[in-house]
Structures are given as structure tokens and as C-alpha cells.
Amino acid sequence: MTQGHKKIIAENRKARHDYFIEDTYEAGLVLKGTEVKSLRLGKANLKDAYAKITNGEVFVHQVHIGVYPFAYYDNHNPLRVRKLLLNKREIKKLYGKVNEKGYSLVPLRMYFINGKAKLTLAVAKGKRKYDKRESIRRREEKRDLDRQRKNYK
């Protein structure tokens, strides 16, 4: 990861519930001016977001960046497709992983580092319903153990 002050704008908490995270990458975003200003106000949502590789480039879809309230006619489309900036080597690696059955690219969080907007992209495999139940059961068991340890002392 890059050094510097990190200000988190948005986080996709549901992704860790719906997917097994295999690997993560940090990517830059190609944005318009009003999008950057909206991000500085914290108006972003990664809930239904996903990424696709098209013609050797990575694009992120369904990332909602709210309109900038002080821009008049020059505002952006909140759900427009945005290009991600990755190295050619990283794109080839991602392409190889995503072509395997069950893998997809999921954005985990969006943040600023040294004034530049970045996105953490994960190679993830979808969980089935019983996997989700299993992780919920493990979390509850861990919580019960922690509670018992606390009460024991």
C-alpha cells in the first residue's frame, strides 16, 4: 500500500459477507472534477458495485457517487462507468483469476491517499447460503467465548 494519510470515503461491508476474499489490489480512479468534490463530501456508495475487464482495461460499474450540490449544469451521472488505473501485469493477473469459474472483482473500499482517490479491488469467490450460515455461526461462537472470558475474570 501507499504511504501517507488515508481518509476512507466508502466501504463495502456486505462484500465480506457475500464473498471469500482471495486477493486485493489498490487501483486509482479516473474521475471528473465534480466527482472528486462529491467524494470529499463523502457521497459515495459501493453497495452493488462490481468491476469488469474490457479490452485490457478494468472498469468499475454501479459505484454511486452523488451529484455535487454546487455544480449547476456541469454535474456528472452518479452511476457512470469509471476506469480503474492498474499496471498491465496486475490486469493480466486479474484476467486470469476472473476467467476461472466463480470468481469476480468486487470493490471493498474507496479512500483518499495524499489527495488521490483510490479503490481497493478484491478477487473474490461467491459464498453459498450454507457458507454464510457457517460464518455467522463462527462469529456467534467467538462472541460467546469472548463474553465468557470477560465474565470469568
Residue ranges of predicted features:
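Broad gene-expression machinery/nucleic-acid interaction feature
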Residues: E26, L31, L46-D48, V81, ...
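C-terminal end-helix/capping segment
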Residues: L79, L86-K92, G126-K153
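Beta-rich strand-turn-strand
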Residues: L86-A122, G126-R128
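Short solvent-exposed loop/turn micro-motifs enriched in small/polar/acidic residues
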Residues: E22, K43-A44, N77, K101-S104
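Intrinsically disordered, Lys/Arg-rich N-terminal extensions and targeting peptides
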Residues: M1-K32, I136-K153
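N-terminal first-folded block
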Residues: R16-K47, A51-F59, V63
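Helix-adjacent hinge/juxtasegments
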Residues: K52-L94
